[in-house]
Amino acid sequence: MKPRSWLLKLTITSIVVLGIPFGGVMAFNYYIDPLWNFTHSNEYNDFQNGFNERIQKTNWINAREGELNFDSLMIGTSRTTYINPSNFKEDVLHYGLSELHVTEYRDYMEYAQKKNAKPFDKIYMELTIRSFDLWVKPAFNEAQTFFDDSEAPFQRITSLFSYDTYERAKFNYEISRDNYTDIYRAYDRNMEVFTDVKQEDIAARIEKLKDQLKARDEYNPKWAAYDEDYKQRLLNIRNAFPESEFIVFTDLAIADRLKLTIEHPQHTENYKRYIRNIVEVFGKVYSFHGYNEVTTNWDNFFDVYHFYPHIGDMVARDLQNGVDTEILTIVTEENMDAYFESLGI
């Protein structure tokens, strides 16, 4: 056999031998689509692990470029991910992101607005009890990093070669096959969340929070700090969306953690300022902070920060109805003092 002929056959054989496994991995990654780069659905990708919503939800938006025509936007931290968009009468684009920092809100909101076919009629915006805390810093890279990565040429294709994508695809295949939702966030292809994750030891976690507060007090009697730019940040957000109605709401906090926080001497005045700033900017705030049968029942929470989705259904109901309920107080300038009194502060 001539050397050139032998070399050509060896090359072709190598390509075939190596190409079949690579092709199989690419096909599998595409079929399961753990990065949400595509729009197809099947029985083996109907549950998706929410490992990083900044990547996944941004990809979900770009996979539907030119097709987005949502009425409203939901923005907030991981707590909002358990408020499913199907609970709303209008079509809601859910851009809830784990550990979303107040300095990141506007970037993600403007990105969603740019991709949507029309201005949002309503923006449901969560501001948590820690959103004003100066010492809480952003936990992720800047938003533009995720936008650039999602829009990078050939990103959808090159990601199919990734072993990391394959590992995530394999996990999603398994939980979809078994209808397994014992993870923190199992998404379907419409960004609906399901979870049966086991509850942590809440009693132990509350005691740990008490110890942490005590340690901070001993280390620095004036450790709590309010972000002096907080109100201006809110004003900038409001002014960036002049055509949208804002429904601003607090996190629904488990009663024990709420009490520890707002009754702490260093937090009480900061909490009042936080509520006051929101009302000054938006006219009202939908507060889910309170002591009631929902917030005092630990069975409604799987940790001291997050409720189960059936409680999120209640939050969605109240955000739309716009009247006080057992779990909601709509705070305005007129009833603010009475609201603080109801919380014992």
Protein language model features and the residues they cover:
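Active-site segments of SGNH/GDSL-like serine hydrolases
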Residues: 238-263
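Well-ordered, non-membrane alpha-helical segments in soluble/globular domains
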Residues: 105-109, 224-234, 264-278
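Short extracytoplasmic
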Residues: 46-73
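Hydrophobic membrane-insertion alpha-helices, especially the h-region
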Residues: 9-30
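Alpha-helical transmembrane signal-anchor/signal-peptide segments
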Residues: 30-49
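Membrane-embedded segments
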Residues: 69-157
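C-terminal regions of proteins
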Residues: 265, 272-344
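Secreted/periplasmic serine-hydrolase-like ester/acetyl group-modifying domain
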Residues: 127, 136, 140-243, 330-345
